[in-house]
Structures are given as C-alpha cells and as structure tokens.
C-alpha cells in the first residue's frame, strides 16, 4: 500500500462513520409510505426548535399531454427514496401584474416555476419523538379557482404544526381552464378535475398520513375563499364525505354566486376560449385536442375574455354542477340538508369586498382614498350585480344609499365595499350557516331516526362515520387590521388577511407584527386546532375549557358569533341580518318576478321605483326640517 493511501485511510473511514452516524441519528427524516420512501427536511421555528417538513410529495401522475383537462390518475409507486425537501412546481395560472413589485399583490402570485406537472402535496410534522394519532389539518388554498399555490409563504404550515402539535397538510390542485374547463358528455373534459385533484389528495391522506404520525380518522379540511368553497363542496359531495371529519370555511361557501356555473354556461365559455385561441372547427373531441396542443400561457392569456359580462368577483373557469360530484346545485343540496353531518367552523372578514373593487370598479385605486362620485357608484353597482335587471339594481341602490348624504364619496366607497362583500361572501355564508344549523337542530330532535334521515349523509363508499354524535356550527367575524398591512387604510380588514393569523406568521419576529398580534395568532391557532381535535373551539387538548368567555354555538334563531381581534372576546348576534335579507330572500324573488315582464311594464316599474325612492328621500328631508328649531317671532 502506498504511503498516500495510508494517509487517506483515516479520512475515508471518518467520512464513512460520519455519514453512517448521521443517517442513524435522523431516521425521522425518512418515511415509508404506500407508494415509496420519502425524505424530508428540518425547518426552524421560533424557540430555537424545528419541525420536520416533507415538501413536494407526488400524489398523482402528471396531468400532461393527453391528460390535460382529464381527471388525474393516482401516483404509481417508486423504488428509490424521493427527496421531499423543496416545494414542487406551481400549477399554471394567471399571474397578477396590476401592481408590479407591490407586496400586497406579489404575496399571492406563484413563487415557484409553473408547470402542468404540479400535483404534489406537503406535510409538516411536529419534532421527534415521532408522534402517533395526531390530529390532521388539510389546507386547500383559494384564488378564485384561477390561481393559488401551496408553496406561498402565507401558507407555511410549520408554525401551526409546531405550536398546536398537529400534522398540517397542503396540496396543489389545477386551476383555471386546466382544472375547470368542461364540456357536458365529454370524458376528455368532464369538468371539476381541480376538485377531483383535491379529493385524490384527501384519499392519499387517508392511506398514508398514519406513516407520518397523523390519525386518518381525525382529519379537518380548511380553506379560504375558493378554498373554503372547495371545502364546502366536499361537505356536499357524497363521495368526499368519508375522507374527512370536520370542516373550516374561511370567507367562502359552495353556494356563493361565483363558485359554480351550469353545464350550458361552461360549454359556452369553453367554446369561446377555443375561438379566442384559434380552435374553431370540428366536434368536441377535435376542440379538446386543439386546446390540448396549445401552450398553457395561450389559454391563460385569453381566460378572462370568456366571461359573459364585465363584472366584479366573477371568474372564468369554476366548478360545474355535473350531476356526479354535485348531485344537485349547491343551493338545492343545502336547502334540503343533503350534506355531511359534522361540526363546522366558518366566518368572514370585516371588509370582504374592498380588494375586488380595485379590479375594474370606476374610481377605485390603492394609491388614494378612493372617494367615489355618485356617478361612479351607480356604474360600480352595475358591475357588482351583473345578473340583476334595472329593478333589481334599484333595490340594491335603495338599500345601500344614505339618502341624507348620497353624494358623500366616502359613504359611496364603503357602500360598494359592502355590496360586493355582502353579495359574494358574507350573505351566502350566513345562509349556509343558518341552513346547516337548522338541520343540526332537526337531527338532534330526531336522533333515534335511521342513518341518512333528513339528508344527513355521512356515509360514502366506505360507510365511514365521523364518530361525533352531534353537529355544531361556530361562526366568527375577523375584524383586526394587521399593523404591517401594505394596502391602504380605506380597504379595512381585507379578504384573505386572516390567513396569516391562522398559520401563525406573527410568531416570526422578523415580520414585524406586534406582541398583541402574536397573542391573537396563538389564540386563533388554538381555536382552529381545538376545533379540529374535538369539534369545539373551546375545548383544549387536555379536555379543559378556557376560563375566558367561551365561543357559543351558532343557531338559526340567535345567530351568535364572536369577533376575532386583539380585544377580549365579545359575542354578537346577527351577521348583517338586514342586508342579507336583501341578497338571500328579497332580491332573488324580485328578479324571479320581474324577469318575466315585458319592456313597457318593466320600464313603468323602474320609474315607479325611482319615484318611491324620491318620495322617501323627500320625506326624510322634510322630517329633518321639521325637527329643526322654528324661527321665533320678530
């Protein structure tokens, strides 16, 4: 043996021993799933600790080539150890360039390379020793069904997993035309494949999460906006019901007006997209073949042009009522009690509409106070309620106008915020909560009835039942504006900006939240995790209940809900009840009646309505005058 070889021997031996010891010291980083082994990574958290993250685990075969627009197939097994140390590609989607470089926009844009090979999920696990039977919380991102990615910083699951000792899971799913383009009767483009992506990820959780220390019988799905609507859609869909235990819906429900379309409207939009990209010939098969051969960006560039009108809070390719995933329309299923019987926690933010006003409503901008003229207000109402006829628009204007001060720019601005938020988020969610609570009460009164009575279908293909003996509803209003928010003050507590508190970002000192905001975030994480564990946000891990004021159940009669902010908890009754009566009851009836009248009668009713509004305004002014101090005799 050469002298140089002898000198190298200790180095080689030391290297071997180091790697061998390191591998033996970190068995928690490698998990054997049903599909194959995955290797994760340690991520730091405050308190000088860490979580173990498995990032970018494939759950489906890539939906590329001929698989575009089709339901994804489950991932095939692999032999080698899969490196799950970085987030995967983001799914192809629209990228918002309205305010380039502005953090309030960029935080929602994809932060990974976009690809159609994007069906991956992530798992965050509390540190060793390896846990067992931990509660699992599965996040579904929002983004109007046209955008979103599980890799966004605001969805980082490490803080929630570490603080509450739960297993956090998130998944990518296809969005836009890739996830929701639909042609009735076509197996090549059946629609709702983005929802089926989510379901496939939930099936992966059922089959594999116990390898990571999670309990497959204790899975709560939660999401925001379109993600919350998706959560609600799984609550409705019979084949999804066995795959989770409870549900949390943040600022979204399946019955909201932007969340679904009919098959006829879906076909119209698909055909329109084909024309826009040059696929104008042949039958359905040829149309889909042509669309499959287009570069993804070509489809994205034309996506917004398929909408039937210029509007606010409407999106091009969304879930379709197909008779399969949805046996009926969400409204019909909710009204008949045809949904999973379990516990739900849901709520809204104070200013749900303000974000969407920046995308087309005249006079609105992030760079000024957006004081809105009466003319711009009336034009914005038309965009905000695109399905309404003139009589319906007049009803909305009447409800939201302060007739003592109708030209006040601030009041017009805030009224538009309320119109968009009430119609698209708050009032559909209130209706969902009331219907759910009503059927929960009926079911409690008829607990001796056979399973499935009153439409409470827990059973799916496996007959799995959540194990809780009762349903319950908990409702919140999030009304804290973060101290470091980049958006202007007039936008208030914006749609989507409770998420950072749910995921614990205020625990990260470098992000410059206040101490009070860190406490609020810890409180919200505790509520969410308590609910996921027990079905009650008040019940802690050890079975104790918080000594402070408790979060009451929501009932259809009292409609109790809590405010979530940095102040001590307060309980309120009724969530914008008067305004929601317009959207949930009066306006649908009004449009149903007036849509069938001829133009002459319609014009007469419009003029009569305007006259009534004028008389109401005149009476208000007269009453105001009458209350003033009268002139004294000279």
Curated annotation (Swiss-Prot):
Keyword Ribonucleoprotein: no
Glycan attachment residues as annotated in the record: 133, 184, 283, 368, 512, 592
Any one biological process term the GO annotation gives: regulation of synapse structure or activity
Annotated active site: 225 (acyl-ester intermediate), 352 (charge relay system), 495 (charge relay system)
An annotated GO cellular component: extracellular space
Disulfide bonds: 91-118, 279-290, 427-580
Signal peptide range: 1-23
Record's keyword terms, sorted: Cell membrane, Disulfide bond, Glycoprotein, Hydrolase, Membrane, Neurotransmitter degradation, Secreted, Serine esterase, Signal, Synapse
EC number: 3.1.1.7
A molecular function (GO) term: acetylcholinesterase activity
Family: Belongs to the type-B carboxylesterase/lipase family.
Protein task: Terminates signal transduction at the neuromuscular junction by rapid hydrolysis of the acetylcholine released into the synaptic cleft.
Subunit structure: Dimers and collagen-tailed forms, in which catalytic tetramers are associated with anchoring proteins that attach them to the basal lamina or to cell membranes. In the collagen-tailed forms, subunits are associated with a specific collagen, COLQ, which triggers the formation of isoform T tetramers from dimers.
Miscellaneous notes: No other isoforms exist. This protein corresponds to the T isoform in other species.
PANTHER family membership: ACETYLCHOLINESTERASE
Protein name from the UniProt record: Acetylcholinesterase
Taxonomic source organism: Danio rerio
Gene name per UniProt: ache
């Amino acid at each position: 043996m050469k002298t140089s070889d002898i000198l190298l021997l200790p180095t080689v031996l030391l290297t071997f021993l180091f790697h061998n010891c390191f591998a033996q010291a970190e068995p928690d980083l490698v998990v054997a799933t049903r599909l194959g082994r995955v290797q994760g990574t340690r991520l730091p958290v405050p308190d000088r600790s860490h979580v173990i993250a498995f990032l970018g685990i494939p759950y489906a075969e890539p939906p590329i080539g001929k698989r575009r627009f089709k339901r994804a197939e489950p991932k095939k097994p692999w032999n080698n150890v899969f490196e799950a140390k970085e987030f995967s590609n983001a799914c192809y989607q629209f990228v918002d360039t309205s305010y380039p470089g502005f953090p309030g926009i960029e935080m929602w844009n994809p932060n990974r390379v976009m690809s159609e090979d994007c069906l991956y999920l992530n798992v965050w696990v509390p540190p060793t020793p390896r846990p067992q039977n931990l509660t699992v919380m599965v996040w579904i991102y929002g983004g109007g069904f046209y955008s979103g990615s599980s890799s966004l910083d605001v969805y980082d699951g490490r803080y929630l997993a570490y603080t509450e000792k739960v297993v956090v899971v998130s998944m990518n799913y296809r969005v836009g035309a890739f996830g929701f383009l639909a042609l009735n009767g076509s197996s090549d483009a059946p629609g709702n494949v983005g929802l089926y992506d989510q379901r496939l990820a939930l099936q992966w959780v059922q089959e594999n999460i116990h390898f990571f220390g999670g309990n497959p019988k204790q899975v709560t799905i939660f999401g925001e906006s379109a993600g919350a609507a998706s959560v609600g859609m799984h609550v409705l869909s019979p084949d999804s019901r066995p795959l989770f235990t409870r549900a949390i819906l943040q600022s979204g429900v399946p019955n909201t007006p932007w969340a679904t379309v009919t098959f006829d409207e879906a076909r119209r939009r698909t055909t329109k997209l084909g024309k826009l990209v040059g696929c104008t010939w042949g039958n359905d098969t040829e149309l889909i073949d042509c669309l499959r051969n287009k570069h993804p960006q070509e489809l994205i560039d034309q996506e917004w042009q398929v909408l039937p009108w210029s509007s606010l809070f409407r999106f091009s390719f969304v879930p379709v009522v197909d008779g399969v995933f949805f046996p009926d329309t969400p409204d019909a299923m909710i009204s008949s009690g045809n949904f999973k019987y379990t516990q739900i926690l849901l709520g809204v933010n104070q200013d749900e509409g303000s974000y969407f006003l920046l995308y087309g409503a005249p006079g609105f901008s992030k760079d000024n106070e957006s004081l809105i003229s009466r003319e711009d207000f009336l034009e914005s109402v038309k965009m905000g309620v695109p399905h309404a006829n003139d009589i319906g628009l007049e009803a909305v204007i009447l409800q939201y106008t302060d007739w003592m001060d109708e030209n006040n720019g601030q009041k017009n601005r805030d009224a538009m915020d309320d119109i968009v938020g009430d119609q698209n988020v708050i009032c559909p969610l209130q209706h969902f909560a009331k219907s759910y609570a009503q059927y929960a009460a009926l079911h409690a009164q008829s607990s001796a009835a056979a399973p499935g009575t009153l439409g409470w279908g827990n059973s799916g293909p496996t007959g799995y039942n959540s194990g809780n003996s009762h349903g319950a509803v908990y409702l919140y209003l999030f009304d804290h504006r973060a101290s470091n928010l980049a958006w202007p003050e007039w936008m208030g507590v914006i749609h989507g900006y409770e998420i950072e508190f749910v995921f614990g970002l205020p625990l990260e000192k470098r992000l410059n939240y206040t101490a009070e905001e860190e406490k609020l975030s810890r409180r919200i994480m505790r509520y969410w995790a308590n609910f996921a564990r027990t079905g009650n946000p008040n019940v802690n891990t050890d079975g104790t209940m918080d000594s402070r004021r408790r979060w009451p159940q929501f009932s259809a009669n009292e409609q109790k809900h809590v405010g979530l902010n940095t102040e001590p908890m307060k309980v309120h009754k009724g969530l914008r009840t008067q305004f929601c009566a317009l959207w949930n009851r009066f306006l649908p009836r009004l449009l149903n009646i007036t849509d069938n009248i001829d133009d002459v009668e319609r014009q007469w009713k419009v003029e009569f309505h305007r006259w009534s509004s004028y008389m109401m305004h005149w009476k208000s002014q007269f009453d105001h005058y009458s209350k003033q101090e009268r002139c004294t005799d000279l």
